[in-house]
Amino acid sequence: PQGYSYITQIGTGNYNEKTSELYTDYSFITADLGIGEEASNVFQNLAVQKLTETTEKMLVAPLRFKSVLLDEMDRVINAAKLGRPASMILKNNSISDRDIILKLEEASCAGVRIDMIVRGICCVRAEVPGKTENLHIRSLVGRYLEHGRIYSFYDGVTTRIYIASGDFLTRNTECRVEVGVRVEDPVLIQKLSNILQLQLRDNVNAREMRADGSYQKVKAAPGEPLVNGQMDMYDLLRDDWLARDAAPAAEPEQPEIKASERPSEPETRPEPVQVAEQPAEPAKQPATVKATPAPAVQSAPAPHAVDRAERHGHPSLFQRLHDWLRR
């Protein structure tokens, strides 16, 4: 409705007080009107046990989640067929959806570079000749539990990034109500891209899948610096937070007055009018004041001292005490 404003939070996890000490997630808070209206519509549909069928900015499973991601993969595949450097980076917990797996095989055969960071269940083989030779899968297991979902698609021109609550499991894409959103802020896109690249360089907690389905721990080459994706990301976010606290508060911008809005000056200025000087009046003599002696003040009993006995002609207790003290 007109006049309404929304603040919407879309996250890859929840606010569980126990798991929040271990899980790492991503949260997107926005005042975007379109996202707010669509999120409100999702809750209204849930209240009447109805599925959300149409959205413009949000991903909403089971009807508008997988289809959007498959469209993004098709866009990258078409870019690769045109000879552009196309790639995808997909980070989630698990993958088992058959449609997505087949689309990843198609993308790999088209020459798309695919990097996946999958912590748990993974039903697709990496680096299989003729099928997934351009698909590379790694898992990160370290101090924190990787729980975030980030889906990045690059078509050789632009990078489109989504965060979502749902994995690539069939139960998420077809059987649950999951949500996601495309991140359009260039600063946030760069930050998420940096996080993904940092985890792809990890040589402390990472294990990579081989063609036979086994995993091999990634080790740093001789002389290569150690990269701990989790702790380096912690340092990155901490430094960014401290830099924000140390930065001086921005002063409010003053509205710029356009030349057309400024008051125009008159072409001819009026000459000042001369006023004839008036002769000064002689100073008046101060009036003399004679002091008169003040009348003597006699003490009298307070009005409240007159009690009921005095009203009947008898001296009151207060009057008798007053007379005794004056003796």
Task: Please state what every model-predicted region is.
Residues 21, 34-52:
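Prokaryote-biased recognition of long, low-complexity C-terminal linker/tail segments
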Residues 1-20, 29-36, 62-327:
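PLD/PLD-like phosphodiesterase catalytic module centered on the HKD motif
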Residues 49-58, 83-85:
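Gly-rich Lys/Arg/Thr-decorated short loops/hinges at beta-loop-alpha junctions or inter-strand turns
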